């Protein structure tokens, strides 16, 4: 999962007057935490004196008036997510298979409790150590199939794709998500990498997902 890497993972947005909340997945039998999400409800977001939303992503992205007025009130911003080491599939075996599903169940429960929620918004992290060509393929693929044509949210300092666009256009030349995804999965694996789990998960969850660009955090 994401986080600061420090023994205590909190920051200013956990301590402000109207802080982010924590969705926690709990195993009642073992009495232990499986994972969690940091989140804030859009209709509870406050604005600073410049009219800018007080959000963890506000230092990286510009939010259009259309997004702030028409989308934010029915949106949940998702922050750091994690699955505890004991429940990560590489070391947990069968009990780790459903940890991520349990997180989705928690988000689903949140939409039942807060019936006005229509959208989830947040960032997915790709670390600098990830293969650059692999990263460029993923970004190109996401932009092709999930682009934000309305300009709802834009990165302040966009991270540009370094690979020649002609190479990527030749690779991802199909009309459907499914066919292009096969290419993406195959080519990334050739590099000795996997598509990051959350990227895979979000793409599979919703065909109406939008990708708002890439920024350096």
Named regions from a protein language model:
Residues 3-10, 207-216:
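Short, well-structured beta-strand/strand-turn elements
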């Amino acid at each position: 999962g994401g986080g600061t890497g420090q023994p205590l993972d909190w920051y200013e947005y956990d301590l402000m007057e109207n802080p982010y909340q924590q969705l926690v997945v709990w195993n009642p039998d073992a009495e232990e935490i499986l994972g969690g999400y940091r989140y804030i409800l859009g209709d509870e977001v406050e604005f600073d004196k410049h009219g800018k939303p007080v959000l963890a992503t506000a230092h990286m992205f510009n939010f259009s008036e259309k997004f702030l007025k028409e989308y934010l009130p029915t949106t949940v911003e998702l922050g750091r997510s994690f699955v505890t080491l004991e429940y990560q599939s590489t070391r947990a075996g069968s009990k780790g298979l459903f940890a991520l599903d349990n997180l989705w169940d928690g988000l689903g429960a949140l939409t039942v409790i807060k019936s006005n929620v229509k959208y989830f918004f947040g960032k997915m992290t790709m670390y600098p150590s990830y293969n650059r060509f692999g990263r460029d393929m993923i970004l190109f693929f996401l932009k092709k199939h999930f682009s934000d044509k309305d300009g709802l949210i834009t990165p302040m300092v966009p991270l540009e794709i370094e690979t020649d666009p002609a190479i990527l256009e030749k690779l991802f030349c199909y009309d459907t998500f499914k066919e292009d995804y096969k290419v993406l999965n195959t080519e990334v694996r050739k590099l000795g990498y996997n598509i990051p789990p959350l990227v895979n998960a979000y793409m599979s969850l919703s065909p109406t997902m939008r990708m708002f660009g890439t920024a350096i955090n």
